[in-house]
């Protein structure tokens, strides 16, 4: 499995793991509201986990990808399968009216 992250200034980070392993994606910023979801992947668009405020996380137990937990900075995936390859979107809303948005997309390839 290879995880590739390209941030806004085109910095590229690659992480590798093996099939059947557990994996944590970590981002260093701590926004107020976070939504993790898959996009354009083998599993289609589906939300995986939402976090609001300080540590109030809700994991989608019906997701086709195993998610053990998440936070504003992390998404913990479990028991990865080759069919779990795809894009993972980290969306953040912040600001006084929660009207400011930023996001990052990770590409995960499980082999």
Swiss-Prot record:
Protein family (similarity comment): Belongs to the HHV-5 IRL6 protein family.
Protein name: Uncharacterized protein IRL6
Protein source organism: Human cytomegalovirus (strain AD169) (HHV-5)
Organism lineage string: Viruses, Duplodnaviria, Heunggongvirae, Peploviricota, Herviviricetes
């Amino acid at each position: 499995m290879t995880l590739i992250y390209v941030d806004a200034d085109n910095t590229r980070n690659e992480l590798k793991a093996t099939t059947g392993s557990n994996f944590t994606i970590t981002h260093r910023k701590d926004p107020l509201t976070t939504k993790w979801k898959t996009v354009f992947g083998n599993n289609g668009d589906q939300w995986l986990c939402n976090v609001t405020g300080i540590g109030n996380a809700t994991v989608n137990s019906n997701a086709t990808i195993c998610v053990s937990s998440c936070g504003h900075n992390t998404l913990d995936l479990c028991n990865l399968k080759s069919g779990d390859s795809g894009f993972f979107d980290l969306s953040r809303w912040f600001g006084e009216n929660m009207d400011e948005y930023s996001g990052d997309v990770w590409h995960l390839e499980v082999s």
